Amino acid sequence: MCIRDSCGEVLTEQETIPAAHRYVNGVCTVCGARDPVSAPCPGGKACPGSRFTDMPPASNWAHNAIDFTVAHKLFAGTSDTTFEPSARLTRAMIVMILYRLEGEPAAAAESAFTDVRSGAWYAGAIGWAAGSGIVNGVGGGRFDPNGLATREQTAAILYRYARFKGCDLDACGDLSAFADAGSVSAFALAPMTWAVGERLISGNAIGGRTLLDPQGVTTRAQFAMIMMRYILNVVQPAPEP
């Protein structure tokens, strides 16, 4: 179920991300949590990403999103000291991050995908996601776990996860604002429209134009931003004034 209650509630027995805070000047008046969007990073050791030598500066668009996802244990570093914001995500990595958000539940059964090896680090996550209707294969009984995740694949997986959680899927973005809207694949049209409507995905500046770039690859920094927006905009929208 998609929780929209007051600060301090949790999403499931396993999850620890509280539902809607009440922020005033960037700080929750109920529990004191810092708004990851509007409040400035405290800097120093208080910055969740302080251990990463390649952390973008606090003025960078990705900084707060990386802080948010690291603090909520959705992302780990690529090493003890690196995050690699520009590194590209694989399909298995996308599923693993959602699996962590869900609290890493036991899968009812292993997936039937022929290229998902039993015991692989992503096997449990893909088994859970496939059994929950969150992921489909790429055809021929394969999942392609090491394939790079495109932006439209990312939108489709997150859309199905939101449906699995019982979240509102009525948001309708205007894809006509993007010059390459016609290049969105049929399977991703509804998910991409939803993702734009929920402000999870915005355009990429390419060649002086703002494009959806649906076949472009999702980076770690981009997905950190998408996940922060998903949790704040979809799971726990701001209360009515």
PLM regions and their residue ranges:
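Conserved small/polar residues in nucleotide/adenosyl-binding loops
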Residues: M1-S6
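Cys/His-coordinated zinc-binding microdomains
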Residues: G8, G32
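Cys/His-rich microdomains that often coordinate metals
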Residues: L11, D35
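Extracellular cysteine-rich, disulfide-bonded modular repeats and adjacent stalk/linker segments
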Residues: T12-R22
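Cys/His-enriched microdomains
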Residues: G26
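Feature responds to low-complexity, polar/acidic, surface-exposed segments characteristic
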Residues: V37-H63, A71, A76-A125, S132-E152, ...
